[in-house]
Amino acid sequence: PIFDPEFSESSFGYRPHRSAHDAVRQVQTIIRGGRRWCVDMDLSKFFDRVQHDIVMRCVSREVHDRRLLRLIGRYLRAGVMVEGVLQPTEEGSPQGGPLSPLLSNILLDELDKELERRGLPFVRYADDFMIFVRSERSAQRVFASVQRFVTQRLKLVVNEQKSSVRAAPGCEYLGFAFVGKRATIQVAPKKLKAFK
């Protein structure tokens, strides 16, 4: 309850009453609004690469109880079992852990606020996000500047093989494709093929 009211309206993952379908409909609305190019970014091994100091800095902006902050720090550093041996964790957030979804949203809210400050329409579901612009040239510039922000400010890695600039009609997000000028929502061909 402390953080969620402050999160962006464009953030959908791991939040109450904000489903993947809501995110997909938001993408459709943005494309229909005239944003014809998208920057589709994938963060490489997001949960494994979360920097503890950056997450703790973000959390401490709203949480001032030192005991709670220490507990969250311990959660992040709890370690993982590798072949029966406990290995300490210097970075990353335990995948499947109860706090990890919230901590990921707290960290990526930094990105959301930056995109809002720049006036860029976007949709983010957990660590999967798309940014929308009007031209290919703008999309290329936004890709480069957001990649810099993610790398320098959040100390995360953009997976360049899975990230791209492309025309928004025809793009795919969360397993759905947006077809034609009306951005009609269809199951993405890859997902349909996998289902068969």
Could you describe each region identified by the protein language model?
Residues 6-172:
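Conserved polymerase palm-domain catalytic core
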Residues 179:
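Polyanion-binding surface elements
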